[in-house]
A protein has these predicted regions:
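Generic alpha-helical transmembrane segments of integral inner-membrane proteins
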Residues: 26, 30, 34, 63, ...
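Short alpha-helical transmembrane segments in multi-pass integral membrane proteins
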Residues: 1-22, 79-145, 193-249, 305-374, ...
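Small-residue-rich hydrophobic transmembrane alpha-helices
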Residues: 51-110, 114, 147-161, 165-166, ...
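Short runs within selected transmembrane alpha-helices of multi-pass transporters and secretion channels
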Residues: 72, 140-158, 166-174, 199-215, ...
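Interfacial/gating helices of multi-pass transporter permease domains
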Residues: 20, 43-62, 94, 128-132, ...
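Helix-terminus/linker motif at the lipid-water interface of multi-pass membrane proteins
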Residues: 30, 34-52, 120-127, 183-194, ...
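Transmembrane helical elements of multi-pass membrane transporters/channels
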Residues: 20-39, 139, 173, 206-210, ...
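N-terminal transmembrane alpha-helices
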Residues: 9-41, 45-46, 59-74, 78, ...
Length: 463
């Protein structure tokens, strides 16, 4: 019976449609991650101080970018819904107001980045590193505008099911960033040697290049011209602005809750010892790369479900959600298998010299990677289920669920297992399993409830 369901023509078509959306998105997500990874590698080869300052500055920049992306995710849901309802004028309004709210957000966020040095000093950071990190942000902060506006236009391409454009623009931007880093950090081929400042300039220019490529597609491709995206671009539409804000701010808050959950875990790993913190950094880097798969499926889910909701088709929503959950399960099982079979090989990639310190990091890393294998299933499902709920324009209750799951349940359990029970790093990761598991279960039942209200039965056939 299960095999017949999996091989039914409708399910296969749902797989095909989902993968056509998700694969380019996964590719663009990975390209973006590789961009940050190469920044770290090149700054590390320049100097230890440059690496520390670059990581500190980039952490603030990425945090602000992730937070602001909540509004662009809201635009994905609203624009896809409007496209599904064949309301092209609403797509245009949502993109326009998405740009407005994004630009306003960026201007506000210039303030903490402009005055970042005293903030770093208040956080107890080294004065010399704080000065370098602040210098990084003075140049990187202008890249927040193209980085987030790019995400708004990404919503348009997803609504029209044209994800390859997103992949192409992101990939070209990431490749350019590597080349620009080589020129500007080290001063190769006659360019000035700028160190940390060079990495920031390269990042800003690469974001701008990716945005320009997207704009070129919007202007040159005939299929996009009827939407007249830039017609009356300065006109304000209050109801669309409110819709994006009301749907988007809970997404921003949920993303802050999740990001700070893992940041809090890093602090606890540092309390244990330096080797545990280093091992955690490696394992989280591996998990972050893998998460791009689940994140791509989540974006695909948001887009497809929003579009089906616009067509008022709850049966299609159930078909899509089942297909994505099944693909997600397959992906998670492959990742879990790799983590369980090759923990030493995965950790060793990040360690060069064979010393007592690196062997300690390797030993701890292998242990916590096994725990990471077990939370993959929950991490995968909470990501896509959250995407489904966003597709149904349900963001406030999921935000509350996220805050409770990650902080009240997850961080508390991590602390208890690590320090009261004495499990150290394994205890911190045990909290990940509990927190992410709690979130995925609540998101699942929330989605079933929302689905049943759409008239598709009780949602009991969901995987």
């Amino acid at each position: 019976m299960l095999v017949q369901k999996l091989l039914s023509s409708k399910r296969i078509e749902a797989y095909r449609a989902t993968l056509a959306l998700a694969i380019p998105l996964i590719g663009s997500n990975i390209a973006h991650s590789v961009k940050h990874l190469t920044d770290t590698i090149m700054l590390g080869r320049y100097s230890v101080d440059a690496l520390a300052a670059g990581v500190l500055g980039a952490t603030i920049f990425v945090f602000l970018m992730i937070t602001g992306s909540g509004f662009s995710i809201a635009v994905i849901s609203l624009a896809s819904n409007a496209e599904g309802s064949h309301k092209s004028w609403m797509v245009r309004r949502y993109i326009r107001m998405g740009c407005w709210i994004t630009i306003l957000y960026c201007f506000v966020m210039l303030i903490p980045m402009w005055f970042s040095q005293p903030i770093f000093l208040l956080m107890g950071q080294d004065p010399a590193i704080s000065e370098l990190a602040a210098d990084y942000l003075l140049y990187a902060m202008w890249g927040l505008f193209p980085a987030l506006i790019l995400m708004v236009f990404k919503a348009f391409f997803l609504a029209l099911v044209r994800p390859k454009i997103i992949f192409v623009s992101t990939l070209i931007g990431a490749l350019f960033n590597i080349f620009a880093n080589y020129l500007l950090i080290f001063g190769n081929f006659g360019f000035p040697e700028l160190g940390v400042r060079g990495a920031a300039i390269a990042s800003t220019v690469s974001h701008s290049l990716a945005l320009l490529i997207m704009l070129a597609f919007l202007i040159r491709v005939r299929d996009f011209l009827p939407y007249k995206l830039f017609s009356n671009f300065l006109s304000f539409h209050s109801s669309s602005f409110r819709e994006i804000f009301n749907l988007g701010w809970p997404i921003c808050a949920a993303m802050i809750a999740e990001a700070s959950f893992f940041s809090g875990a890093a602090i606890m790993m540092g309390w244990i010892n330096t080797a545990s913190l280093a091992a955690h950094g490696i394992v989280i880097e591996i998990c972050a790369m893998v998460f791009m798969i689940y994140y791509g499926l989540s974006y695909a889910g948001t887009t497809q479900i929003s579009s089906a909701l616009g067509r008022n088709d709850p049966v299609e929503i159930k078909t899509i959600s089942n297909a994505i959950l099944e693909l997600n399960l397959m992906a998670a099982c492959v990742v879990i298998t790799i983590f369980l079979l090759f923990p030493e090989a995965l950790i060793s990639v990040f360690l060069k010299e064979d010393t007592a310190e690196t062997r300690e990091v390797l030993d701890i890393g292998m242990k916590i990677l096994l725990f990471a294998a077990f939370f993959q299933l929950f991490d995968a499902f909470q990501a896509v289920l959250l995407g489904f709920l966003r597709g149904l324009k349900d963001t406030l209750i999921p935000m509350i669920i996220a805050a409770i799951s990650y902080w009240v349940v997850g961080i508390t359990t991590s602390y208890f297992l690590a320090f009261n029970v004495g499990l150290d790093g394994e205890g911190v990761y045990g909290g990940f399993i509990i927190g992410l598991g709690f979130a995925s279960i609540l998101f699942f039942f929330r989605f079933r409830r929302k689905l049943s209200k759409l008239g598709s039965g009780d949602g009991s056939s969901l995987v």
